[in-house]
Amino acid sequence: MIGTWVAHIPWLQDHLRISKATLGLCLLCMAAGALVSMPLTGHILDRLPSASVVRATALAFCLMLPLPLLATSPYMLAAILFVFGAANGAMDVAMNAHGVAIQESLGRPIMSSLHGGWSIGGFAAAGLAALTAAAGLDPRVESLIGGVGLFLLSLWITRRLGASFTHSSEGHVLSLPTRPVVLIGGLCFLVMLAEGAIGDWSGIYLRHNTGASPAGAALAFTGFSLGMAIARLGGDLVNERIGPSRLLRGGAALVAIALGAVLLIGQTLPSVVGFVLCGLGIANAVPLLFSAAGRINPRGPSLAAAFTLGYTGFIVGPPLIGVLSDQAGLPRTLALLVVALVAVTVLGGRALGRTDQDSRVGGAEVVVAETRS
């Protein structure tokens, strides 16, 4: 769904004849909607079965998919994107919460594979959008067909979601996250800040700092995305072999070393290889941290807090790199990401090591049930 929308952003900008700055403000409205809905969804998950919340948010998001492309003004687009982002944020929290429930019912890690499915879906949607654009199909028609098709597919899939969780404790109100949740959320912030910054600025680094051609610069994001997809599809197997703490810390260390080498060498081909390694290293950090947050009671709010902090890093990372690079240069600014990933390497073991104990604290009972419709 997200891939379908993102692929049509350039068309929408041309269609509305808006500047990059105006488009950026509209996209910030989408992010604002997500940041509002994520904590609220966490508390809804504390009271309703996760499968029910996934079903409701997924179906609502599918119905909203064509709406941004139907906007006739920047103001209309901003309002639509706020609601669109809220639905997307709610669905993301619900899906990850349900993924944690399925993972615990199976007794083995699956979160990396689930996030790998997201990566594959994004590639597929972007490829389909390119084909339909080449065929001359109006993006509004494509998004309408896609929205209806994804609604029917989601309706079928969400009837077969399996295990779900609800939290049986009473009286939870909106409250500040606990110290373990803050630690995990802080690591999510650093990891997703690095992920967003590398994704958006790796190509620009190749173009302006290594002298790569436009086609060569595009290989930076392609290699980074390829590395992430491969690592996520194999991440659960590695997790079972070496454990989540070693996988998180080793992956963060790999990204720090690879990105540091990219910045020191400053040549196109080695940099592309380095960005592939960055994708391999960073891919499983978010699934591991979300799994850890989902084991801390109260589970829905804990996961939502980690997700919100991480998403904030993903949002602020790319523009922050842009602002700082104007003053210090892009290579020096990207070097700050190396420092952030070293921090993840140092603190990752402490964050994941405490979640098993904290998931048993608080006297609240987690009910895992089969959801059938």
Feature-to-residue mapping (PLM):
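C-terminal transmembrane helical hairpin of 12-TM major facilitator-type secondary transporters
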Residues: 242-289
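Short amphipathic helix-loop junctions that connect adjacent transmembrane helices
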Residues: 6-21, 200-216
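Helix-loop junctions at membrane interfaces in 12-TM secondary transporters
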Residues: 69-80, 263-273
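Conserved MFS/SLC helix-loop-helix module at the cytosolic interface between two early adjacent transmembrane helices
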Residues: 36-75
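Symmetry-related core transmembrane helices of the 12-TM Major Facilitator Superfamily/SLC fold
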Residues: 140-159, 332-350
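Intracellular juxtamembrane helix-capping segments at the cytosolic ends
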Residues: 89-105, 283-297
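Interfacial helix-cap and linker-helix signal at transmembrane-aqueous boundaries
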Residues: 12-13, 44-45, 131-136, 206-207, ...
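Helix-to-loop junctions at the C-terminal end of transmembrane segments
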Residues: 36-49, 133, 231-244, 325-326
